[in-house]
Amino acid sequence: MARQIGSRSLARRSGRSQYLIGMRPSRRPLRGLLRMNDFLNAIKGLHHPEERPEGASRRTHDSIAALTAAALSTALIALPAIADEEPKYGGALTYMIPADAPPSFDGHRESTYATVHSVAPFYSVLIRVDPENPADITRFVCDLCTEMPQLTDGGTTYTFKIRQDVKFHDGSPLTAADVAASYEKIVFPANGQLSARSSNYLMVDKVEAPDPTTVVFHLKFATSAFLPALADPFNFIYEKAILDKDPRWYEKNILGSGPFKFVDYQTGQSIKGEKNSDYYHKGRPYLDGFTGIYADKQAVRVEAIRSDRAAIEFRSMPPSARDELVKALGDKITVQEGDWNVASAVTPNHKRKPFDDPRVRRALTLAIDRWNGAPAISKIAIVKTVAGIVFPGSPLAATKEELEQVAGFWPDIDKSRAAARRLLKEAGAEGLSFELLNRNVDQPFKYVATWL
């Protein structure tokens, strides 16, 4: 019997207002891929046995194999090395989802782990970060396509050939038309529709499916940001026939072509899936099924792991909760720690005064003491490294010295706040006060909001 806390993960084995704060997976193309793909790899069991890290659980039958050091954040792994073992089939994974419920099931609309951790196992995507090497966020592999495309027209045309052996869970064949329709919804949302990542696709001119096995993306200009944007793990492929009838159907319903079929959803309690015996990646998944349990209170999640009511949480815990589990479980648990690739984000509504004035927005970012705040909050909340828009330590990440030249990252907080006060005065917003909306989840939202 063993447990694992993860980085955003925790695992155990056994037999509208003016201002908003929230943590979300990054919307920049080179962020927001690693950690969410770690969850997808784990639940789908996508690693080859010879490349599995230490710590995979017997109960989860190597489906937790993606929780490597490269998976980043706090990880408590509690097993001897089993890299030489063959994968084992069967069993069910029970994992915690640190939320009361997803706002909707539509991955195109949402940007919260509450949605992707709930429904990603039911869906396919066009391409993804390589599950055999998730630390390399510049390498992408096919899920629904047959091979990665060769660029044409000076890098402005991407042509994908689509597999012909894929079926939706209702028995309908998945074709290029479904892929194109899904990306049309993501890239060019119709009036009244929300697309959380449409701004990542400003380079896209049009998407077309000239035949049932071909999808073509035509770009306005060549850019290396396009493939990372395509590989976003929220880009579920939906059935065109359903979207044509009701483009909002997927907000309240689930029907995909992924490794698991939807079984049951109890609002605020759980979501369940069962193995898709017709899954096109032969031999996967290893699990017979899974259950995700919702709990927005950390104490509930800690107790679930400790008492073996759940095997894993795919996010993190602050040091106090981590240490509590280590103390309770002793040598059955091992800690690995690293960085996150999510942002604790404060988002002003730039369409409302005074936040429509860039001087006010600049003043707000100047007032936040990131360098002193992050280390302090990290002692009681799941807050990690101060960073820019690219994952810290990755090839394109800004250095600390480079960040310190950016407004909001200056090392002298007194200088920053003096500049902030001047800007507010210039904008006629001295004595500014506002309502701060915050997610009703304890970690890390309430702690970060209180500090702010």
PLM ranges: what are they?
Residues M1-L76:
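Intrinsic disorder/low-complexity segments
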Residues R16-Y19, N37, A56, K88, ...:
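Surface-exposed binding/hinge segments that line
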Residues T94, T175-S182, P212-H218, G258-P259, ...:
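Alpha-helical secondary-structure segments
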Residues M96-D153, E184, N253-G256:
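N-terminal lobe/hinge region of extracytoplasmic solute-binding protein
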Residues Y113, E147-G192, P210, V216, ...:
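Aromatic- and charge-enriched surface segment that lines or borders ligand/interaction sites
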Residues I127-A135, A231-P285, G289, A299, ...:
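Gly/Pro-rich hinge or "lid" segments in bacterial periplasmic/extracellular proteins
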Residues I186-P189, K206-E208, V263-K272, T291-R352, ...:
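Extracellular/periplasmic solute-recognition and catalytic clefts
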Residues F260, A381-E426, V441-F445:
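Structural transition elements
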